[in-house]
Amino acid sequence: MTTRPDAPASAAWTGQTGAPTRLLLLRHGQTALSVERRYSGHGDPELTPLGREQARAAAARLAGVPGVAAVLTSPLRRARQTAEAVAAATGAPLAVRDGLIETDFGAWEGLTFAEARERDPGLHAAWLGAEDVAPPGGESFADVGRRVAVERAAVVREHPGATVVLVSHVTPIKMLLREALQGGPGILYRLHLDLAALSIVDFYPDGGASVRLVNDTGHHPVSAR
C-alpha cells in the first residue's frame, strides 16, 4: 500500500507522540537571477512569467491539501508573489515571517559563482568549506540556520497539530530539512531543490520529526519540465 505524502501522519509508523505540525515547504518560482544562476539573497527581483506560472501550478497542487491553516512567507517579493497565489487557492490567511528570508549574500549579491570567486578567491573558498564564514557584508550559513530554527519553533508553537505552508528560499528550506534529518553541514551542498519545488516535514511536540517528501516538482507546468 502506498501512502500519499500529504496524508495524515501515523504515530505507529514514526514512533513519535502527539499530533505533528505539518510544514509544506515551497520554494518560490523563477526570477531573472535564478535563470542566470546568480546569488540571489536579500535583493528583491520579481517572478518571471514562467515563475508566475510555476506559482499558480504549485497553488493548484496545494489547494488539494485539506485543512491548510496558514500560508507564511519570506518578506521578499519573489516569495510573496508565490505565496499570494497559494493563499488565494487554499483560502488560508497569509502572513509575512522575516525569519524565512534568504541568506544575505552581501557583496556577492547578483554575482555568479565564478564572479564571486574571482572577486574574493580566498574568502569564497573558505565560505564553501565552513558554515561560520560569511560573504563580505553578508550572513553565514550558521547564522541562517539559527534564525530558521527559531522561526520553525515559533511556527510549531503557534500552529500545534496544524498544516502550514511556508514559502521560502533554497537555503532556509535546506536548513529545515537538515534540522528534521539531524544532518550535518554537507546536506547544504548535496541536496538539490528546484524552483517551486515542494517538500513536506512533520514536526512533533516531543521534538521528533518525519520528512515525508523532498523536492517534488510533479505539479510544474509542462513548459518548465
Q: Where are the language model's segments positioned?
A:
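Acidic, low-complexity terminal tails and accessory targeting/binding regions
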Residues: 1-22, 58, 103-115, 157, ...
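Active-site-proximal alpha-helix that buttresses catalytic centers in soluble enzyme cores
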Residues: 2-11, 15-92
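Generic beta-sheet signal
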Residues: 23, 162-168
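Short active-site segment of divalent metal-dependent hydrolases/proteases
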Residues: 31, 172-173
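Glycine-rich phosphate-binding loop signature in dinucleotide/nucleotide-binding domains
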Residues: 64-67, 155-162
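Short beta-strand scaffold positions
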Residues: 73-74, 146, 167-168
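Phosphate-handling substructures
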Residues: 89-150, 210-215, 223-225
